[in-house]
Swiss-Prot record:
Sample GO molecular function, one term: RNA binding
GO cellular component: chloroplast
Major place of residence: plastid
UniProt keyword list: Chloroplast, mRNA processing, Plastid, RNA-binding, tRNA processing
Location relative to the cell: Plastid, Chloroplast
Statement: the UniProt record of this protein carries the keyword RNA-binding: yes
A Pfam family per the record: Intron_maturas2
Biological role: Usually encoded in the trnK tRNA gene intron. Probably assists in splicing its own and other chloroplast group II introns.
Source organism per UniProt: Quercus cerris (Turkey oak)
Protein known as: Maturase K
Keyword Chloroplast (UniProt): yes
Gene behind this protein: matK
Family, per entry: Belongs to the intron maturase 2 family. MatK subfamily.
Length: 504
């Protein structure tokens, strides 16, 4: 009955774009916490029920408006150990509630946009490996690239103003602004500037929402200017989940730029501009001269400093020539190189050879950063010599081999698109020998003596190369299929960077 009542209230609030009433609904916080507020309560507060939890939320909001956090902690510290024991817990409770409630209008608009529309859902586009086929197609024809580190944190007031385009409830926005500034002041001893980074550890969901809102605002302006400056305008686009009010904002920007910046579209005109981004790192590539890239660089720095109140300097954007420098993107080193080939042509009775050298995008495994990640995880030392994993010596032999095998397969799966397999073979060698040394240490023996004592089939699955799996699954697989497997393969089921691969 309570769940049905919640859906009725959700439908009624949706008609008027009200979010403020959800702050005082218990199911909002139950949804945020998974098992209710008691999940985050201390042992002294196990007896709190739902009504008491909601009462705590109301008292916290009242106290926050009074701008005096000592009212509750001084008067209720003896009666209620919840307030006196952990002063930051109330901020965590409210921030988790805000994180759930502020997502409601975005979710409802997404559902309404999908209703009655036959939209094919390309789940493969969620894969970060789907970016590389795009790079392979476009980047060999480009000359220069700009490695961009998107600066953060943005000022909290800028974030609230950004949310005004999407959230129409003034009461909710006022409370959200008040909470962000009060929480920032409460943490001013650690972090001096009012930023969204203070939520990165205490409430990752709320941090990601604010950070994505900041990126959405930045890219909507950038996309508008990119389309205005291009000879080949963007004519269509799919459902952009982070661009719910993009077209409304574009109309507004069209008026602003037409009145105040009439020369910018011609100033930055380039028909061969491509842009990709993952998290806080992006790449801007062009076929034009370095002069145009420097103009974009100057514009982006001014955009961040003037519009978002984020300090940025020119060093955060590095412009390089694609044929001479490698791109460090998605834990791959990518570069454009010549691929010489000889083509034999036959015309009637005459035949001749043509030397053709098209550009090709090379993607290789970053061996030095990856060895650094393995050394940090205690699989090897700083120079790449395998060592035993002490924390796994108390496990069974099967569990030790299975865990090393899982890590090795995940890395091989992620770096399947590498042009050169030699670096990956070295990483596999480190993991395999680390596994052997871990087992030898467990059995109080040396690695050489342990390998002589066990059967060869003991490590058969661990030492099987990826190319062998094709032969095991398809015994009659053709030579062309095996050769294709030994080349670059992009798996479209990878949606995040492997933990050991994330060296940035």
């Amino acid at each position: 009955m309570e769940e049905f009542q919640g859906y009725l209230e959700l439908d009624r609030f949706r008609q008027h774009d009200f979010l403020y009433p959800f702050i005082f609904r218990e199911y909002s916080y139950a949804l945020a916490h998974g098992h209710g507020l008691n999940r985050y309560m201390l042992l002294e507060n196990i007896g709190y029920d739902n009504k008491s939890s909601l009462l705590i939320v109301k008292r916290l909001i009242t106290t926050m408006y009074q701008q005096n956090y000592l009212i509750i902690s001084a008067n209720d510290s003896k009666q209620n150990p919840f307030f006196g024991y952990n002063k930051n817990l109330h901020s965590k409770i409210l921030s988790e509630g805000f994180a759930i409630i502020v997502e409601i209008p975005f979710y409802l608009r997404l559902i309404s946009s999908l209703e009655g529309a036959e939209i094919v859902r390309f789940y493969n586009l969620r894969s970060i490996h789907s970016i590389f086929p795009f790079l392979e197609e476009k980047f060999p024809h480009l000359n220069y690239s700009a490695d961009i580190l998107i600066p953060y944190p943005a000022h909290l007031e800028i974030l609230v103003q950004t949310l005004r385009y999407r959230v129409k409830d003034a009461s909710y926005l006022h409370l959200l602004r008040f909470f962000l500034h009060e929480y920032s002041n409460c943490n001013s001893l650690i972090i001096t500037n009012k930023s969204i980074s203070i939520f990165s550890k205490s409430n990752p969901r709320f941090f990601l929402f604010l950070y994505n809102s900041y990126l959405c605002e930045y890219e909507s302006i950038f996309l508008f200017l990119r389309n205005q400056s291009s000879h080949l305008r963007l004519t269509s686009s799919g459902v952009l989940f982070e661009r719910l009010c993009l077209y409304r904002k574009i109309e507004h920007f069209a008026e602003v730029f037409a009145n105040d910046f009439p020369v910018i579209p011609c100033f930055l005109k380039d028909p061969f501009m491509h842009y990709v981004r993952y998290q806080g790192k992006s790449i801007l590539a062009s076929k034009d001269t370095p002069l145009l890239m420097n103009k974009w660089k100057s514009y982006l720095v001014n955009l961040w400093q003037c519009h978002f109140d984020v300090w940025s300097h020119a060093a955060s954007i590095r412009i390089n020539q694609l044929s001479k420098h490698s791109l460090d993107f998605l834990s791959y080193f990518s570069s454009v190189r010549r691929n010489p080939a000889v083509v034999r042509n036959q015309m009637l009775e005459n035949s001749f050879l043509l030397n053709n050298a098209p550009n090709k995008l090379d993607t290789i495994v970053p061996i030095i950063p990856l060895i650094g990640s393995l050394a940090k995880a205690k699989f090897c030392n700083a120079v790449g010599h395998p060592i035993s994993k002490l924390t796994r010596a108390d496990l069974s032999d099967f569990e030790i081999i299975n865990r090393f095998l899982h890590i090795c397969r995940n890395l091989s799966h992620y770096y399947s698109g590498s042009s050169k397999k030699k670096n990956m073979y070295r990483i596999k060698y480190i993991l395999r020998l680390s596994c052997v040394k871990t087992l030898a240490r467990k059995h109080k023996s040396t690695a050489r003596a342990f390998l002589k004592r066990v059967d060869s089939e003991f490590f058969q699955e661990f030492f099987t190369e990826e190319g062998g799996f094709i032969s095991l699954i398809f015994p009659r697989a053709s030579f062309a299929l095996r050769r294709l497997y030994s080349g670059r393969v992009w798996y479209l089921d990878i949606i995040f960077i492997n933990g050991l691969s994330n060296h940035e």
